[in-house]
Structures are given as C-alpha cells and as structure tokens.
Amino acid sequence: MLKSNKVVVVMPAYNAAETLEKTYNEIPFSIVDEVILVDDFGQDNTAEIATNLGIKHVIKHEYNKGYGGNQKTCYNKALSINADIVVMLHPDYQYTPKLIESMCHIIANKLYPVVLGSRILGKGALKGGMPIYKYVANRMLTLFQNILMNQKLSEYHTGFRAFSSEVLKNIKYNDNSDDFIFDNQMLAQLMYKGYEIGEITCPTKYFEEASSINFKRSFVY
C-alpha cells in the first residue's frame, strides 16, 4: 500500500523459470500488496516456481496467447482485485524491480498517471549489454513514433511500465493486438486520451535467459 493506493505487480511470463525467483526477491514488498503471474503456456515450470514463492495469483494460459494477450490477462486480473496502481515487470530480470517504488510514488503523488522505465535515458541500455543493432533500431523507431505522435519519449518499447487504475479503465486495451505491437498500441491509446507519460531511467541486463522481441518482429509496426 502506498498513500492508500493498492499496488499490484503483474508479471507476464514465458519460460521464466531461470530468472523468476531473483526477480521476485527484489520486489519492494514494503509497498507492493499483491503479485500476479500469468504463464503464457510456457514449456518449463515457471508456474510451479511462482506458486512455491507464494505468489497468490498464478494464471496458466491453456494455449499461447502471445505477449499482448498475456498482458491483457494481467491487467484484467489486476483490475478485478481492485488495484489502484499496476506495475508490469518482466520476470526475466532484465529490468530492476528496485525502481518499482520510485515509479509508484510518481503516480501516487499524481505527477503522472503513467510511468515508463526507460533503458535509453542515461547509459542504461548499452552499459547493460543491449546489442548495437537493437539500440539503433530502438532509436530509429522511437524517432519515427515521436514525430508521428508529436511526443518526446525516449523509447516506446520498454517492458517496465506503471499505470494508475484509472488509465487502464479508460482505454480499450483488450481491443489491441495479442502480439508485441500491443505495447505501442497501448501508448497510442494513452496519448489519444491525453494522458501525460513520465519516464525514469532504468538500468538493464542483457543475457541469454532474458527474453525480448527479435529484430524482425520489432519492425511489424
């Protein structure tokens, strides 16, 4: 709980058995009330590990619904348990959970209703090992999207995001794609509705177990 706001962390998972526990152990439970993990029909024991860690809400898809479909389940469940602030955190340990508290404070203090953990602000991406081709593609796509949307975000492709429940209730995210383009569609919906979006610099880690969109699919949108 943070300033009377119920904080819920949602974790869209796919074969995250190797990294889930260390990600979970860094979540700041001094403010986080509940955690939701959605296993998108992965082939490992992610769901079992989540249950053993004490995660109360573990949902297993009966078939692979895709990255966007996974997020829809996450957000729908968070709203159903009356979350006031919802933080999406990938369980692949690429993003540090230690920033959750800072992101939530920004929303709880009504500075911004949406906060993105940006890998591009500062030197987080390259220092953390982001491949050069991904960094260049990210910068090019972000430039194009900023021009298209008349915005000045440092990136549109981060998987570390925090939302007020009001925001989630007022956009039709369930109408979006079930694939990776979901993230960009969601940001476009927020901008269309006039919501201000804040950013916070986020150090990242790139290693074999960390999952991310591949180069080819990043150009779908």
Could you describe each region identified by the protein language model?
Residues Y63-S80, P97-F180, Y206-R217:
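Acceptor/aglycone-binding surface of glycosyltransferases and processive sugar-polymer synthases
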